[in-house]
């Protein structure tokens, strides 16, 4: 198991307010994966745990849609999101990857004030500007940058597993 502890983000189904959170934590407990709950947001659980927790939860969960490594957390305005992206060492994050894609997902109407397609395009342009050798691949990217918009927060992540 990869023992590197990171903040991980799980995008959950929104059909029940508590069951997906319980399912995720039960899977971690039953597999003896040490974790610390950081925060619960609408359809999102943030924990501190080994990176391999993403794969374990993805393999066993029915109410988890995506498991990611949290790279940045900020206010949900485009300006704050783009600043957070630019503040990251994207060359280090993509050092073993040759291609990337960007997706933005708003949950429970928290992204109504945003133009998702434009935000994806802007984030992609900033990443491409910072990492000149990486190419955009919308079909089968080596790295998927996934931003979740929930409550008043944007969570900029590197996707590990999609269910």
Residue spans for each PLM region:
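Short, surface-exposed recognition loops or helix-turn segments adjacent to catalytic cores
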Residues: 133-146
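Non-catalytic nucleic-acid substrate-recognition regions in nucleic-acid-modifying enzymes
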Residues: 2-130, 138
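Structural beta-strand/beta-sheet cores of well-ordered domains, especially the beta-sheet scaffolds
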Residues: 8, 98, 143-145, 152-154
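Glycine-rich adenosyl-nucleotide cofactor-binding module
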Residues: 148-163
């Amino acid at each position: 198991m990869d023992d590197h502890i990171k903040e991980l983000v799980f995008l959950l189904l929104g059909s029940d307010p508590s069951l997906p959170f319980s399912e995720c934590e039960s899977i971690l407990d039953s597999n003896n994966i040490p974790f610390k709950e950081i925060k619960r947001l609408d359809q999102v659980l943030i924990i501190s745990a080994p990176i391999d927790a993403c794969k374990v939860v993805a393999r066993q969960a029915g109410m988890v849609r995506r498991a990611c490594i949290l790279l940045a957390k900020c206010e949900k305005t485009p300006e704050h999101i783009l600043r957070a992206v630019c503040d990251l060492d994207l060359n280090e994050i993509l050092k073993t990857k040759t291609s990337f894609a960007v997706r933005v997902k708003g949950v429970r109407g928290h992204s109504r004030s945003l133009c998702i397609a434009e935000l994806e395009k802007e984030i992609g342009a900033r990443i491409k500007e910072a990492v000149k050798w990486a190419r955009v691949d919308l079909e089968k990217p080596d790295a998927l940058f996934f931003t979740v918009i929930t409550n008043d927060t944007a969570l900029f992540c590197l996707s590990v597993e999609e269910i």
